[in-house]
Amino acid sequence: MRLDHISYVASHDQISDVVNRIGSQISTAFIDGGIHPKFGTRNFTAPLLNGQYLEIVCPLDHPATDATPFGQAVKKKAEAGGGWLTWVFSSSDLAGIEEKFGRKAADGYRTRPDGSELKWKQIGVKEIIGSGELPFFIQWLTDNHPSKDGNSVAKISKLVIADDEKLADSWFQDEIKSALTGVEIEWVKPELNEGDKGIVAVELTVNNSKIRLD
C-alpha cells in the first residue's frame, strides 16, 4: 500500500481558475484528465514526485453524480465551497481490504481527451462522505498512471488533517501510517476546520521551497 494521490474539489464554473492557480503555485502543468462517466465528475491532474499526483475534480450536471458515492462526495464538497476532499492509497491487491469492508470494490474508468483510457477498482468511497479524514483505496488496472503525465517538480511533504482520534476509527490505521514514507501528518482539532474532520491543508516541496495549499 502507498499514498497514490490527493483530491481537491472545485465547482464546474471555477475549476479552470483553480487549475491555473494551483498549477502556478506548484510550478506544474495540469492536464485534462477527462470525464468519469460512471461517477458524473471531471478531473484535471498534475504529476508529482514519488509516483503520486494531485487531482482537481468537479461535479457535472449528470444523473450519475447523484447516483454514485464518489459523485455525491464531490458534489457535496463543491456545494460547500470546494477544497480538499480526500487522500487515496493504492494497492496491487484489494482482496484484504474488500474483506474488511465486506463488499467488492467498484470499477472505475475515464477516457482522456486523447482517447486513452484509465481503468481501476476503488473501495471506501462511501465512508468518506461522512468521515472526511478517512482515505479510500484504489487498484490500478492500466499502466498509464497520472504521475507519468509531464514533468514533476513538487512532492507531498505534509498533510494537515483535522481528526482528534488520529484515524483510530479506521480499520487500516497501521497500514496507512506505515505507507506514508517521507510524508508527515500534522493532526489538528476539528474545531480549527469549522468542526469538520478531514484534510485541512497539504504542504508540498517545490524546488526546495515549501508551498501550503489550503
Task: Label the model's feature ranges.
Residues H36-F39:
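A short beta-turn/loop motif at secondary-structure boundaries
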Residues M1-D4, Y8-A29, T41, P47-D214:
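Glyoxalase I/VOC metalloenzyme domain signal
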